Design a protein with these regions (language model features):
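Amphipathic alpha-helical coiled-coil segments
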Residues: 45, 49, 53, 143-146, ...
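N-terminal amphipathic/basic-hydrophobic helices that include classical n-h-c signal peptides
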Residues: 1-11
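Long, solvent-exposed, polar/charged low-complexity segments
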Residues: 9, 14-28, 57, 61-64, ...
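Soluble extramembrane domains of integral membrane proteins
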Residues: 70, 75-109, 113-115, 159-177
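Residues forming anionic-ligand binding surfaces in small-molecule and nucleic-acid pockets
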Residues: 38, 126-127, 204-205
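Short, hydrophobic/aromatic alpha-helical segments in well-folded domains
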Residues: 24-25, 41-44, 107, 118, ...
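Aromatic- and glycine-enriched beta-alpha-beta binding-site module
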Residues: 86-151
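Active-site acidic/histidine clusters and adjacent loop/turn architecture
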Residues: 27-85
Length: 242
């Protein structure tokens, strides 16, 4: 919380983390995605992107604890919840050195070093901001464990994904489904579309106005709470505490 002083009072105001300067920087980076430009604009990155993102991560610790004590908001500069702006170009033809978005990943404490683990995710990009959660591209044993849980507990899956508080806020990701039924499941299974998922994620769109509003911490915390039933189901399927 920020504060202002009125005669005889100290008034707490919601903190504003990001400004439109975040999106201005990222748009310009997309047009000038090279090391000399980034080096010349390093302080803008620090001021508009990294410092406010780390401040948000630090302040998310308490509301995240209210959702689950098994996920972490880690504000470390290296190895924490904020993804590096530098791209990994080792296995791609796209050699541009920088990402043109900011990403925050609040992972399960049992799998903190794994980007393919259950997590909350916040994506900030000009014209494409969203909050997401779930499990992205899990290894085959994890994916199979989730499919087995969906088939064994269809009512719990429906409660987690198709009812409030989840369903008014989130939409399940479409992803790139399997072409055929996964091993062990019949072609006429009533939940075949869900069983064929490669990713078990959900997302909700955010406007830039919401991201730059003073109440964004509370706004995003409410979004995390709405997604809790979905993450709870995934964690139980993987024998992870929630």
């Amino acid at each position: 919380m920020d504060s202002v002083t009125a005669p005889g009072y100290l008034v707490l105001m919601p903190t504003r983390y990001f400004t439109p300067g975040l999106f201005a920087f990222l748009r310009e980076l997309a047009d000038n995605n090279n090391r000399p430009w980034f080096k010349a604009n390093q302080e803008r990155y620090e001021e508009q992107v990294r410092r406010p993102a780390l401040a948000l991560i630090e302040d998310l610790a308490e509301p995240l604890l209210a959702v689950s004590r098994h996920f972490t908001a880690d504000p470390r500069l290296v190895g924490g919840s904020l993804f590096r702006i530098q791209r990994d170009t080792r296995f791609t033809r796209d050699r541009t050195p920088y990402k043109t978005h900011a990403g925050i990943h609040l992972r399960h404490v049992a799998t903190r070093e794994d980007v393919h683990a259950p997590a909350f995710y916040l994506h900030l990009e000009p014209g494409n901001c969203f909050a997401a959660l779930g499990l992205w591209k899990p290894a085959a044993p994890r994916a199979q464990a989730i499919r087995t849980a969906i088939a064994a507990r269809p009512d719990a899956w429906a409660r987690a994904t198709r009812r409030p508080p989840f369903s008014p806020v989130y939409a399940l990701g479409e992803g790139d489904p399997l072409r055929r039924p996964p091993p062990g499941f019949a072609p006429d299974h009533p939940l075949l579309d869900d069983l064929k998922r490669r990713d078990f994620t959900a997302s909700t769109r955010l406007t830039q106005a919401r991201v730059t509003a003073p109440g964004f911490l509370d706004d995003y915390a409410a979004t995390m709470r709405a997604g809790a039933p979905f993450l709870r189901f995934l964690c139980k399927a993987l024998d992870l505490a929630f």
